[in-house]
Swiss-Prot record:
Protein function: The key enzymatic reactions in nitrogen fixation are catalyzed by the nitrogenase complex, which has 2 components: the iron protein and the molybdenum-iron protein.
Keyword Metal-binding: yes
Cofactor names: [4Fe-4S] cluster
GO molecular function, one term: ATP binding
Gene3D superfamilies associated with the record: P-loop containing nucleotide triphosphate hydrolases
Binding site for [4Fe-4S] cluster: 97, 131
Subunit organization: Homodimer.
Organism: Trichodesmium thiebautii
Keywords carried by this UniProt record: 4Fe-4S, ADP-ribosylation, ATP-binding, Iron, Iron-sulfur, Metal-binding, Nitrogen fixation, Nucleotide-binding, Oxidoreductase
Biological process according to GO: nitrogen fixation
Residues that, per the record, bind ATP: 8-15
Sites bearing ADP-ribosylarginine, chain numbering: 100
Protein known as: Nitrogenase iron protein
The enzyme's E.C. designation: 1.18.6.1
């Protein structure tokens, strides 16, 4: 059994990318998969289940009084391709640590024997910054392969570098390795070249470039993966290619994160930092002009 995790900047399309890829792994390649959602939004399994946000382990435990009172079938639901789906959940906004939900859920699943008869366990983890709680799948050596979903946008690359730094921190103590960068395209100029360059500097690979296609949004509106909604579409083939690459991936490395000035040099080299600063400068000038008119 292989334990993988998808990390990435908030809003980058991490949950969408992971569910579409895992759907192809299960449906086309017969892989037995369990998804453990590690995001308080509980949206890591929505497309696989063709349903609204799944009831979380923490929610059921709170209703019953303790996690020891929870039955496995109350929180583990089968979805498309036989994929088992669990959402860890989190506390009320502003109260407690969301990372605690991940720890509670994983311990519960292990004690209940949920990790048997599987080829892959996939953790879908919130993460602009790998804080202690959200790093739990890495820190406790649960997730062995980390895939970072990013794009050619500056903040997505900044987050990818931060996550690589978190992987490095625990790589020597445990067996966690970086499996590669998944570029979820935002149609940035020279995006493929940029992410390949970043991957090389991080001592990893751009495992796949996922082109931007509106069919993904059309499927999402219907709470479906592209594999279910339009299996013959070119986008379904792209997710299948990524699925194959993950199944056959042997390039698992210890990352070499960049210093901030090195990352900025890379962005300058590709003209991205200058363009971003120009946009910010124009916005500030416009704001000042508006204030002067008042």
């Amino acid at each position: 059994m292989r334990q993988i995790a998808f990390y990435g900047k908030g809003g980058i399309g991490k949950s969408t990318t992971s569910q579409n890829t895992l759907a192809a792994m299960a449906n086309r390649h017969g892989q037995r998969i369990m998804i453990v959602g590690c995001d308080p939004k509980a949206d890591s399994t929505r497309l696989i289940l063709d349903a609204k946000a799944q009831t979380t382990v923490l929610h059921v435990a709170a209703e019953l009084g303790a996690v020891e009172d929870v039955e496995l079938d109350q929180v583990l639901k089968p979805g498309f391709g036989g994929i088992k789906c669990v959402e860890s959940g989190g506390p009320e906004p502003g109260v407690g640590c969301a990372g605690r939900g991940i720890i509670t859920a994983i311990n519960f699943l292990e004690e209940e024997g949920a990790y048997t008869d599987l080829d892959f366990v996939s953790y879908d983890v919130l993460g602009d910054v790998v804080c202690g709680g959200f790093a739990m799948p890495i820190r406790e050596n649960k997730a062995q392969e980390i895939y970072i979903v990013c794009s050619g946008e500056m903040m997505a690359m900044y987050a990818a570098n931060n996550i690589a730094r978190g992987v490095l921190k625990y790589a020597h103590a445990g067996g966690v390795r970086l499996g590669g960068l998944i570029c979820n395209s935002r149609k940035v100029d020279r995006e493929t070249e940029l992410i390949e360059n970043l991957a090389a500097r991080l001592n990893t690979q751009m495992i796949h470039f996922v082109p931007r296609d509106n069919v993904v949004q059309r499927a999402e509106i219907r709470r479906l993966t592209v594999e279910q909604y339009a299996p013959e579409d070119n986008q379904a083939q792209e997710y299948n290619k990524l699925a194959e690459k993950i199944i056959n991936n042997e390039k698992l490395t210890i990352p070499t994160p960049l210093e901030m000035d090195e990352l900025e040099e890379l962005l300058i080299e590709f003209g991205l930092l200058a363009a971003t600063k120009k946009i910010v400068r124009n916005k500030l000038q416009h704001k000042m002009q508006q204030q002067q008119k008042k």
